[in-house]
């Protein structure tokens, strides 16, 4: 017969009493009413907050943007194929945030900051909210440092400063992404962290951009956030905010950052899809009423913070695609009004072989010469006006048969100026090389060459200066001024090289 030992029983009871936990856990739950098209309608979830993350029974995460009288509209961050009607949903009490750290440099991630490049997990101990407030007026200062793109047309006539928002706008296939990627390539050695956000693009296009960065050593200082065309609309809508959160992390650590959103038209389309499925009332072009706020709260996060917040900066280059050059459509006008200027790429110029196809006449930088070094101001001050006058004269000259000598000379000069602005893709130029190029054109040294010889001569001249006259580059980089000494060195080099070049061409 089994003997019952009273002290053993009392010990067990005592242990159980000690382990008893009186904590009451209140979980805010709901039930799925319907699910489909990346949207779920939930009954219950009475205490849920706007924008709160919710978790479904099978693990899918969603965001609750629509709080209605008898149900909650949730957008899914995934396909949601395993979610069933009647399954339970619980509120998490958190809003969307991502891990951030230096370890993200050189990686390709998705909108949830998960790596998609097959190179393992990314370790991070710090988190940032995907949507964080933009710096206020007092915590900003005006833009004063240049951010060199390496493209002569931009750095000389439409300069971009650190902390500026400059829109790149144009039709499809006009080289918008090329301008943005060249700018990233030109940041090598400039201590600038770059974030490239690809929204709704073909996976092959993103892979091509990443390959270019890897070949040119740009991935060392770049993070690529990619949500391709087959991603759910929710993730395409979130991707730019994820990129901004990563760039802000570096900005507040006193680093300079550059972020490219490629492109915001596709983000607006993804947001429109979400809003219409949530049955929000449509407005102009069927976009919801808050599509302006969608972009303004994103682009206002780019800033040049005041010295109290450190000497970091976040420069944004949003890209917007137009339909047959129509900049008066809804999204283009919205983003133009938010940004500090725009670079307009023209399909006509692109097809005429002028690449980058920047229409200098209607492109503008609202920061202006504050974002240029003194040497560039000295050399390129009049070039925008000269090109505008040339374009006007060229249009007029089509109808005139006999032109006087002065007009012919002005047309010849304009054609050569336009020629020197042409650049091959992925070949950005340093500031000193740009100064050499512009000075040679604006001072008439190219007038004696044929148009077809201009680019060949300029390559030869820049190579000669780099190898034989390194002091020119030293003067520009140390003083940032186009001094008399620098001008003397340059004049001498141009005259030497032009004579040599003409001799070579004759033989």
UniProtKB/Swiss-Prot annotation:
Which residues participate in ATP binding?
A: 170-177
Which GO MF term does the entry hold, naming one? ADP binding
Q: GO CC annotations?
A: chloroplast thylakoid membrane; proton-transporting ATP synthase complex
* Keywords carried by this UniProt record: ATP synthesis, ATP-binding, CF(1), Chloroplast, Hydrogen ion transport, Ion transport, Membrane, Nucleotide-binding, Plastid, Thylakoid, Translocase, Transport
Give the PROSITE patterns listed for this entry: ATPASE_ALPHA_BETA
Q: Which membrane topology term applies here?
A: Peripheral membrane protein
According to its UniProt record, this protein's enzyme class is translocase
Keyword hit for rRNA-binding: no
Q: Which reaction does it catalyse?
A: ATP + H2O + 4 H(+)(in) = ADP + phosphate + 5 H(+)(out)
Q: Keyword Membrane on this protein?
A: yes
Annotated family: Belongs to the ATPase alpha/beta chains family.
Subunit info here reads: F-type ATPases have 2 components, CF(1) - the catalytic core - and CF(0) - the membrane proton channel. CF(1) has five subunits: alpha(3), beta(3), gamma(1), delta(1), epsilon(1). CF(0) has four main subunits: a, b, b' and c.
Q: What is this protein called?
A: ATP synthase subunit alpha, chloroplastic
Species this chain originates from: Nuphar advena (Common spatterdock)
Species classification:
Eukaryota, Viridiplantae, Streptophyta, Embryophyta, Tracheophyta
């Amino acid at each position: 017969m089994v003997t019952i030992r009273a002290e053993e029983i009392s010990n067990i009871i005592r242990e159980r009493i000690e382990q008893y936990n009186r904590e009451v856990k209140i979980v805010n739950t709901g039930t799925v009413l319907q699910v489909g098209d990346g949207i779920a309608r939930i009954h219950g979830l009475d205490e849920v907050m706007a924008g709160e993350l919710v978790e479904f029974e099978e693990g899918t995460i969603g965001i609750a943007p629509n709080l209605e009288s008898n149900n909650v509209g949730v957008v899914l961050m995934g396909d949601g194929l395993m979610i069933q009607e009647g399954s339970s949903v619980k509120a998490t009490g958190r809003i969307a945030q991502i891990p951030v750290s230096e370890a993200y440099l050189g990686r390709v991630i998705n909108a949830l900051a998960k790596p998609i490049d097959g190179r393992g997990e990314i370790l991070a101990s710090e988190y940032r909210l995907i949507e964080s407030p933009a710096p206020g007026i007092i915590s900003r200062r005006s833009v004063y440092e240049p951010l060199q793109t390496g493209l002569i047309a931009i750095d000389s006539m439409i300069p971009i400063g650190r902390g500026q928002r400059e829109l790149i706008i144009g039709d499809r296939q006009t080289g918008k992404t090329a301008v943005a990627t060249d700018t990233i390539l030109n940041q090598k050695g400039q201590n600038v962290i770059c974030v490239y956000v690809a929204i709704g693009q073909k996976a092959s296009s993103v892979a091509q951009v990443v390959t270019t960065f890897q070949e040119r050593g740009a991935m060392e200082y770049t993070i690529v956030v990619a949500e391709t065309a087959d991603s759910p609309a929710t993730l395409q809508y979130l991707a730019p905010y994820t990129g901004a959160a990563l760039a802000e992390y570096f900005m507040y650590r006193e680093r300079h950052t550059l972020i490219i959103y490629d492109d915001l038209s596709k983000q607006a389309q993804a947001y429109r899809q979400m809003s219409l499925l949530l049955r929000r009332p449509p407005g102009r072009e069927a976009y919801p009423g808050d599509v302006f706020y969608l972009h303004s709260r994103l682009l206002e996060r780019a800033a040049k913070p005041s010295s109290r917040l450190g000497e970091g900066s976040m420069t944004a280059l949003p890209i917007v695609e137009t339909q047959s050059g129509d900049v008066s459509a809804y999204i283009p006008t919205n983003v133009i009004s938010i940004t500090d200027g725009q670079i307009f790429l023209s399909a006509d110029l692109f097809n005429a072989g002028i690449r980058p196809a920047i229409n200098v006449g209607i492109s503008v930088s609202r920061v202006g010469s504050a974002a240029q070094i003194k040497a560039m101001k000295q050399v390129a001050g009049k070039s925008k006006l000269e090109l505008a006058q040339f374009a006007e004269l060229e249009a007029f000259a089509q109808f005139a048969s006999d032109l006087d000598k002065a007009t012919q000379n002005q047309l010849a000069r304009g054609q050569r100026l336009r020629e020197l602005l042409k650049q091959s893709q992925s070949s950005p130029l340093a500031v000193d090389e740009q100064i050499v190029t512009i000075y040679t054109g604006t001072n008439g040294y190219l007038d004696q060459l044929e148009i077809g010889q201009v680019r060949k001569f300029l390559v030869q001249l820049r190579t000669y200066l780099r190898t034989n006259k390194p002091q020119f580059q030293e003067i520009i980089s140390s003083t940032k001024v186009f001094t008399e000494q620098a001008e003397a060195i340059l004049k001498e080099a141009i005259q030497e090289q032009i004579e040599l070049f003409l001799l070579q061409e004759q033989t």
